Amino acid sequence: MAAAAAPRSSGKEALPAALGSASEPPRLFDGTTRLYICYFCPFAQRAWIIRNFKGLQDKIELVGIDLQDKPAWYKEKVYEQGTVPSLEHNGKIMGESLDLIKYIDSHFEGPALLPEDPEKRQFADELIAYANAFTKALYSPLISKADLSAETVAALDKIEAALSKFGDGPFFLGQFSLVDIAYVTIIERIQIYYSHIRKYEITNGRPNLEKFIEEINRIEAYTQTKNDPLYLLDLAKTHLKVA
């Protein structure tokens, strides 16, 4: 898979204010493609990253949703599950972040983020399918305040090994792909949480993961979507009760 080159960017875009309970909905199904996100949600961040990487800022409008003061119209008129992200496109609404990143990759212009190589494609499918289990393995001990489990360590070791499968780059498939988008928003947060709360550095003894984090922070489409680490830590302590 050749390296996917992201379109040039002028830096962070001016984000619209997140819409709360007192807000009015946008004019739905008026032909505008809209991506509904929460600016600090790791799942919504996945869709936000691919939008930016493919250079779709002028094609997909961001609509921020305040999850702490969620507007009733979002669940009633937009996405009945009430979660983010969701995408309004061609008169339809769809959700689930791992499905959305695949949809955006295949239905919009810009660099392709899944490989044609059959071996890499199969590995990509396997890793994307594992992403939810990885998230659960890393978040569960934090939320339950349990000790660092063998399952948690095994999940980190699994992605460390996965990052060594292909030698043509620092990412899961060598070059940047949907797999990296599926994992980076979770890795971003667990690195902060485990370091500050458990005094455990997830990169210790995992050089591939350390290199992955270093290199993905050179990708502007990702860094444009990041929040301040201490802000994310405060949110986790407040809303997930992880402290």
Curated annotation (Swiss-Prot):
Q: Which ranges form a coiled coil? A: none
Residues noted as binding glutathione in the record, renumbered to the chain: 70, 84, 96-97
Q: Where is the GST N-terminal domain?
A: 31-112
Alphabetical list of InterPro entries matching this protein: Glutathione-S-Trfase_C_sf (IPR036282), Glutathione_S-Trfase (IPR040079), Glutathione_S-Trfase_N (IPR004045), GSTL1/2/3 (IPR044629), Thioredoxin-like_sf (IPR036249)
Q: Name one Pfam family in it.
A: GST_N_3
Q: Name one GO molecular function term.
A: glutathione transferase activity
Where does the GST C-terminal domain lie? 117-240
Specify the domain of life of the species encoding this protein: Eukaryota
Query: Per the similarity annotation, which family is this?
Result: Belongs to the GST superfamily. HSP26 family.
Protein name, UniProt field: Protein IN2-1 homolog A
